[in-house]
Amino acid sequence: MDEAATTPEAAASPVRANLASVAALAGVSASTASLAFSGAGPVSASTKSRVLAAAAELNYAGPDPRGQSLRRGRSGIIGVVLEESVADAFRDAMNIATLDGIADAIGASGSALLLLTDNADSPSSFRTVPLDAVVLIGCSTRLADAVHVFTQRGIPIVGVEVEPLPGVLAIDLDNREASRVLAEHLRELGHCDATMVTLPLDGAHTTGWLTREREARSEGYTASQRILGVRDVFAEAPGYVASASTVDAGYHAAFAVLAATTPTAIVAQSDVLAVGVIRAAHERGLRVPQDLSVVGFDGVRLDGVAPIDLTTMVQPAFDKGRAAGAGALALLDGVTEQPRVFASDFHRGSTTAPPR
């Protein structure tokens, strides 16, 4: 027996199928086979069926998308830049709904989403990652470096609830006006002592009482706009900055507020923060809304907190994301898009009442 014939080195390597071998088996030209896969040309149904059958027989999955990208001059990737870690971002129902909207908008184009995070190392990675367009979601006001890098690369930029910047297509939400509506609702009920529990104002997620200095240094565009909306009604309303948009963060912020002051209403900058506020109030023996009115923002479905029907502003996060995705595709096609501002709807729930 010839041992050499049985060694791995001597074993014949399987021949990898390619477009040419598929075309030969199907009895067509390589260009016709390519069109059968891409669907971009006039290929009859019978010819396409013959090509796909040959590909299946040879276990050929189709042309390398990298080659297609090179020929088109595009990567087929739309980047989405988040201001926080992916894990934290996916804890926020609004981020998920916005991403869902973006994916819905770009799906028919064949593009894929690539999630990126905005951190200290971002400008370096932004210079090399292959992208056709980029969507910035709720990123901090320190966006100039990232925008500069993407602009230098000629990559179209869409910003969802970001600080207005030249060269960035803005898809915004009426954060200031919506917060003013919430505050006005409380004032109409008779409240004059409202305190805010805000979203984080910096990348370190520093908690504590809101000061004018912290407001001036705020890196959180959405949080700052919502603060301004409340201040349009309650000019001197105090605030406490939460560490995140979570129930636990809302609980700890509200516990600190209620340990030091006795407001008749708390304006939470997200619904999940509001749930934490309500839990802290109950722990301190306060009834909502009899002793303390609480409002939120977003209009998310709050599982496991029944029978709470939160007074809040309902924002169209999916539609906002869809507009961002459509805007990115339009910019790629050289179409000039106009900025858009989405409006939130007021929902009167069971968590607000006149002060005692």
Region roles according to the model:
Residues 1-5, 14, 77-81, 85-187:
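Alpha-helical recognition/docking segments in bacterial nutrient-uptake
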Residues 1-74, 356:
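N-terminal helix-turn-helix DNA-binding module of bacterial transcription factors
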Residues 84-97, 118-122, 171-181, 196-253, ...:
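Hinge/beta->alpha junction and helix N-cap segments in small-molecule ligand-binding domains
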Residues 131-138, 195-197, 240, 261-270, ...:
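Periplasmic-binding protein-like
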Residues 142-154, 188-191, 195-205, 322-343, ...:
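A charged, well-structured terminal subsegment
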Residues 192-193, 237, 288-293:
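Short acidic capping loops at alpha-helix termini that bridge into adjacent secondary structure
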Residues 251, 255, 259-356:
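Flexible loop/turn connectors
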